Amino acid sequence: MASAAEQLASNLNFSTFAKAEDLKKRLWFTLGALLVYRLGTYIPLPGLNPEAFAQAFQGQSGGILGLFNMFSGGAVQRMAIFALGIMPYISASIIVQLMTSVVPALEQLKKEGEQGRKIINQYTRYGTVLLGTAQAYAIAAGLESGNGLVNDPGWFFRISTVISLLGGTMFLMWLGEQITSRGIGNGISLIIFAGIVAHLPTALAGTLELGRTGALSTPLILAIIIMVVAVIALIVFVERAQRRLLIQYPKRQVGNRMFQGDTSHLPLKLNTSGVIPAIFASSLLLLPATLAGFANTATLPGWATTIVGALGHGKPLYMVLYGAMIAFFAFFYTAIVFNPKDTADNLKKHGGFIPGIRPGERTAEYIDYVLTRITVIGAVYLMFVCILPEVLISQTGVPFYLGGTSLLIVVSVTLDTVAQIQGHLIAQQYEGLIKKSKLRGGKRGR
């Protein structure tokens, strides 16, 4: 049996790609949308003093503000209209998904299929507007409290900043949805991916410059390269790993013919939640500290300054909260995307069963038992990948872009996008086979 790599090589050939017109249109649309996003990160907010802000950001870039800048694709560094990025949408998604688990009306909507999903998505958009407005106003007020950051402070600046930042977030939300429906891959993840990748050359150049000046020793740079390669290999391995449950189907009679029972597998991914826990945890941790970072620390209460300092990148409290949130969202998001009871009911409906397990409720309990245990492994893997490199990097001063979270997002989104491209190419091959069989059938009919 061919391996996944061999199947990918056989599907990703030039002749098949050249015939896949729909795939090419989707790829061009995705690239165009990401280009629009990158251009938007260079459009500055009106009324801001760019020189003063650049100087103020330079003093904060080594902290958590620099990490938020990575997720926004450099828009925070330039205080562009996309400075809020897609984080308000992600935060709203977290809140709405949590509410679907505790609010009966929303839980019922979730069970109504496509129509219910559209209503829940609309609630998420409303939540994005509310969160985006609050965060944009906090940024505007924080900028005004800075020394000389705003040319003409006042309500006009605050309103224009809120409109610009909120408009940027809503545009990115719409752009992400368009990429998902008309392009390739998950639009929201690709937007974050594009922001990180855009700054990878700068991070690599900065690391090499640190080595050239002697700030980083050659053995340390080699160790960092080995660590990055090892983390990438681990991510690829775990993201493709599966726990397969054997499914059997009994013999069945159709007319006068008896068909033998068939066997198949129910694949359970080791990391069912994917990259979502890292993105969710980052968004919740980054925003409060980032909003405080824009403000003048002299105007903050003592307790707020203490919390902001404790939540600094690489600090123990930051790592503990980050790991706890990753573990929570790994289990929470797995429960959202995979329902053992629905899977067991579908198996029972089609006559399938797990050997030694009674169909129905017992099958659902067994699937949940297996899924819970592999999710523990997935959560530990996510915490290891996201936290350990961050600890090492915080001790060496290497740019954030080489951290575990950014590597996880880049590799996971790349794997997901390549898998979707492969799916389109396979569909194109099947279409070609169907057309050939129809032509042969027509010739025989003549």
What are these regions (language model features)?
Residues 2-110, 115-446:
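N-terminal cationic and glycine-rich segments that engage phosphates or anionic surfaces
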